[in-house]
Amino acid sequence: MTTGYILIAAILILGGVIATVGDRIGTRVGKARLSLFNLRPKNTAVLVTILTGGLVSATTLAILFIADEGLRKGVFELEDIQKDLRQKREQLKVAEEQKTQVEIERNKVNQELETTRTDKKQVETQRDQAKKEKLKAQQDLAQTQAQYQRTQSRLGQVVTQYQKAIAELQSVYNQRKALQGAVEQLKTERRRLYAEAKKAIEQRDRELANRQQAIEQRDRELANRQQALQQRDQKISQLDKIIQNRNLEIAQREEVIAKRESRLKELETQQDYLEQEVARLEKYYQSYRDLRLGKLALVRGQVLASAVIRTNQVAATRQIIIQLLQEANRNASLELSEPGSNSANIELLRITPDRIEQLIQQINDGREYVVRIFSAGNYVRGENQIEFFADTARNVLVFSGSEVLATTTADPRSMTSYQLRQRLDLLISASQFRARNAGIVEGVQIDGTFLRFVSLLRQLDQPIEIKAIAAEDTYTAGPLRVRLVAIQNGKVILST
């Protein structure tokens, strides 16, 4: 700042001195009536004044140019500086765009990684769902008792399928293990490539920051900036090539991983299916073998104890439920104990306070309920502990007296005793089916003498209609008493 003041003062003083000297010279030239270049004295004086003024201006500019290098470069190199500044700004803009593109690609890679984690969670959810379905399939095994006859004929096929399924399961397990190893290796490679790409991006960001700082310092380092920018441009180009190569490798790895994971999901699905089939076939085979050997003492869904309960006091309800569970335990002990053994004090049922409280909450409202204790699985003699489940249902009217349960037709003239007996058994089975669907677990009781009814049917000589009707009002607690009637031309001619 002091140098500027001195420079301005020197220019003012020097300009005044030169102007004064020029005026004196012009005055003396005018008085002396000198003539230059054959001009008149007056014109000569004017010319001398012009020359002194030009000298003042030239001296001023010379002092400014000599004293301030920036002013000298600004006057003579202004266009070059502006042109170079525009080029540097364009290069900075391109570098910022490249930086933005790299950040977008990095975000894209992060999104793909997040998608991979989401897919993994979906696979785990599907696996949990498959386990639930497996549990449901185990519960449906109660229906296998009705398929006993068909299972006996298919035993050879089941054993063959079992062995084949075991072989396929082992093969799938080996493939899955190999693919899991390959997937883990590819994931490790992907993480390495991502780390290298991230490192390259961070290095490029640092280079861009240095470049931005160099642009801001262009007034102080203008002479060396061009070379530094060229070096940085070369580094950026190299980094761009490296990033492009890394991105290409990552894309290829991602594609391979996606294919491997897809194949792994297929194999896992196939493995789950084969495991379910193997478990189902093993249970079928075990149930068939136990039935064949006569070992099953309790079957799934068998009623261990039942009672009709109506109370609204928690203590009384708890006492009744405990007594019912004790009765179920005694009945199970009788079924599972070996002949001649003492099983009176053996606790077979897994009874917990939580299950008792759950039953109390279900029936403790003052209404009448039917509570049944069922066997939760198939058990052989000698078992020391079994699972059970309880069922509660309102004890309501299910069938009114004289309500028709099932109907069939028969012609005693053309049917043998065995065929007639089969037709009646089918009628009774249909009645049992309706009773079970309505919630009555107790068996069907035939009201009257069944054999006498069959004998009288054999004596008829015309086609008849046979109906199974409820002998009395039947509630959920049961049992259902059935009366068989034979109808001919709309009239009841026989009845049990």
Swiss-Prot record:
Main location: membrane
Subcellular location: Membrane
Secretion signal, residue range per the UniProt entry: 1-19
Keyword tRNA-binding: no
Keyword Ligase: no
The species this protein was found in: Nostoc sp. (strain PCC 7120 / SAG 25.82 / UTEX 2576)
Protein name: Uncharacterized protein alr4393
Keywords: Membrane, Signal, Transmembrane, Transmembrane helix
One GO location term (cellular component): membrane
Annotated region (Disordered), positions in chain: 113-137
Transmembrane annotation, as ranges: 45-67
Domain of life: Bacteria
InterPro entries registered for this protein in UniProt: DUF3084
Pfam family, one: DUF3084
Bilayer topology term: Single-pass membrane protein
